[in-house]
Amino acid sequence: MIEVTLLGTGSPIPDPNRAGPSTLVRAGGQVFLVDCGRGVLQRAAAGGVGAAGLSALLLTHLHSDHVGDLGDVLITRWISTFTPDPVPLPIIGPPGTAELVAATLNALRHDIGYRIAHHADLNAPPAVDVREHTDGPVWDRDGVSIRVAPTDHRPVAPTIGFRVEYQGASVVLAGDTVPCAGLDELAAGAGALVHTVIRKDIVATIPQQRLQDICDYHSSVEEAAATAARAGVGTLVMTHYVPALVAGQEEQWRALAAREFAGRVELGDDLHRVQVDAPS
């Protein structure tokens, strides 16, 4: 069984009810944070997970709304890990991830220096193990395996999706993308597909070109549902709602998905959980 928790279902626009894009995946006693949008650790704490308990951080791409709280994750994990010789945090993402992590740590160098000067048991900066990938296996530990494949969020490039597998259960996390062959292949036969969705029918009517532009490189509800159908997944989990999902409108979004996908559809607020079982 794999458990998926939608930590942040929001967008780049601040929302008092939704944290920035982030998803928690629990499998085989391991805990993976996929993207780290604003407010992610507060939502994780509400779900019973602290930064020190993360097995790895997985980044789909380097847009600010998906990595905005990277510094908080790095520093909070560092100061809340009390075991000697802490294991470096594995950070897996597309090319550019190492530069982003290094720049983030450099921006926080004063804070890091203050804490090292103050605490005798902190004698080194936060330990990280950054790995950049665009395709193939990236994790194989205690029965949990993860592989990545390219997605299409151009001009943001490269971008990747993740497939997590454990004891026959499988979950694919698409990140931001339009329909593409890489995601179709990655999601083939998966138990669940976690996919960003936007209401292009609404966004296209907003009289600001900059906002209309987001239609170019995101999937609509119907497009995400069509991807789920092509890939033959069991459950479509929609997240990163643009515009924000309003209470009472859930059935509108479900109806749009149902035009293309006959399977189970999950959507909801931050901390919504979905259990994904192995096929019986």
Swiss-Prot record:
Keywords: Endonuclease, Hydrolase, Metal-binding, Nuclease, tRNA processing, Zinc. GO terms for molecular function: 3'-tRNA processing endoribonuclease activity; metal ion binding. Pfam families: Lactamase_B_2. Binds 2 Zn(2+) ions. Zn(2+) 1 binds at H61, H63, H153, D176. InterPro entries: AtsA-like_MBL-fold (IPR044094), Metallo-B-lactamas (IPR001279), RibonucZ/Hydroxyglut_hydro (IPR036866), RNase_Z/BN (IPR013471). Its cofactor is Zn(2+). The keyword Mitochondrion does not apply. It catalyses: Endonucleolytic cleavage of RNA, removing extra 3' nucleotides from tRNA precursor, generating 3' termini of tRNAs. A 3'-hydroxy group is left at the tRNA terminus and a 5'-phosphoryl group is left at the trailer molecule. The active site is at D65 (proton acceptor). Its EC number is 3.1.26.11. Zn(2+) 2 binds at D65, H66, D176, H240. SMART domains: Lactamase_B. It is an enzyme of class 3 (hydrolase). Homodimer. Zinc phosphodiesterase, which displays some tRNA 3'-processing endonuclease activity. Probably involved in tRNA maturation, by removing a 3'-trailer from precursor tRNA. Belongs to the RNase Z family. This is Ribonuclease Z. The lineage of its organism: Bacteria, Bacillati, Actinomycetota, Actinomycetes, Mycobacteriales.
